[in-house]
Amino acid sequence: MGWFFKDTNLVMLQTPHVFFSPDPFERNLDTFHRMPNEGELFYGIVQDGNDLWNASFFCGSCAIIRRKELMEVGGIAVETVTEDAHTALKLSRLGYNTAYLEVPQAAGLATESLSGHVGQRIRWARGMAQIARTDNPLLGKGLKFGQRLCYLNAMLHFFYGLPRLVFLTAPLAYLFFDAHVFQATALMITAYALPHLAHASVTNSRIQGRFRHSFWNEVYESVLAWYIMRPVLVAFINPKMGKFNVTAKGGVIEKAYFDWTIARPYVVLLLLNLVGFAVGIGKLFFFSGDEVITLIINMVWTTYNVLLLGASVAVANESRQIRSTPRVAAALPAFLRFENGRTLVCKTEDFSQHGLGLSVPPDSDIPTGSRVSVSLFRSDEEGVFPAVVTFSGTGRLGVQFDNLSLQQQAELASLTFSRADAWISTWGTAQRDKPLRSLGSVVLIGLRGIGQLATSAFKSSTPRPVSPVSKDSTP
């Protein structure tokens, strides 16, 4: 809040969006807290860059906005489905300042399923295309040149759908039809393209190391490209089309399954690239000279696309999620009181809305079903909550809260989910990027995705045994 007193022209302060549950990429690929997620690049680097040019924008939550100035622009913008960014653009046009503080202050749930994740990104893409069409930052008054470029960059980002699909299919034009995508010799293409690709990879790795690993941008874009291409193009032509949808969050996935519906575009593209690669192998026996080099270049390109599409397929393999409320890893001081007067000092391993995982001395003999009072602390504040022991193991204890009142639930949230230090400890702490290691992880996940696709296809095609009808059964 101090920045609002220091700068009376400041109308909006945005902080990062942090998620205490894994998104579909992190859960289905098992990369949670080991690899930066899709959104960390934006909140770790892009918004900081926007802030340099006074162009950081509102992202819907985790922000403070002055009410008086908000009313000057008619309140939250409703003309587009990305009302947050559009509202910030309107405020910037009036000459007000916006700011970004890269210190997590709150956290929330990520999307549970890939279909929900795709639906959310479709709305973002459609909304940004609507703003670009109806309130283009390059046009109109009030913005400085740097602000115009920053807002334009945010909007044009979601137009990657068509270029990404072209990238995933371009080498097939040569493999199937002998059509040259580039009118140049194979040697010239290699001489110009390889140094550029190597330089771009090293540069991005150095700049984005903590917030985006090499080659993962291609995976994210490959998953979303098919689904955002049409909404973006339609919204840019007719910005009034499309409606606002709220992203559903929270829930369980009782059984692991392969989402054939959402994966259909990736599967088709994957099969096309595999067939193209097979055609390329056949042509190796008939081509000669420079044609062989051109063929090999296109086959290498196709191999890369196969791995990207395999990774995209792997994301569609939804893993089981039986917890209705996610657990957040955190080491917080805790204190247990038993009914017989015994006390025990311990620490939390994780917490959720309904219970705690506790680290206790290995020799603690605590039977399952014991009723305890759990104390949690924040500075000089203490909260006491009734609980029941549901798990007791060597050095570990699981407790479930017992009929908390509304006031106790609010106090629990204050001592756990509302702690800013709980989110700072995991922000930007993923391993720094190493391009070769990152490429290796994409290759392995791509191969795993192809294997999962084959397994799921086999299971789907295998007829299920039919149980015989009993003679005594009635119609």
Tell what function each PLM region has.
Residues 81-87:
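Acidic donor-binding loop at a coil-to-helix junction in glycosyltransferase catalytic cores
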Residues 90-106:
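Catalytic donor-sugar/metal-binding loop of nucleotide-sugar-dependent glycosyltransferases
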Residues 110, 117-135, 215-232:
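Intracellular alpha-helical coupling/juxtamembrane segments of multi-pass membrane proteins
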Residues 2-81, 92-93, 114-153:
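Long helical/loop segments within the catalytic core of UDP-sugar-dependent glycosyltransferases
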Residues 157-242, 258-319:
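Membrane-embedded multi-pass helical conduit in multi-pass membrane proteins
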Residues 257-475:
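Structured alpha-helical
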Residues 239-252:
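Juxtamembrane inter-helical linkers in multi-pass membrane proteins
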Residues 102-116:
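Active-site donor/metal-binding and catalytic loop motifs
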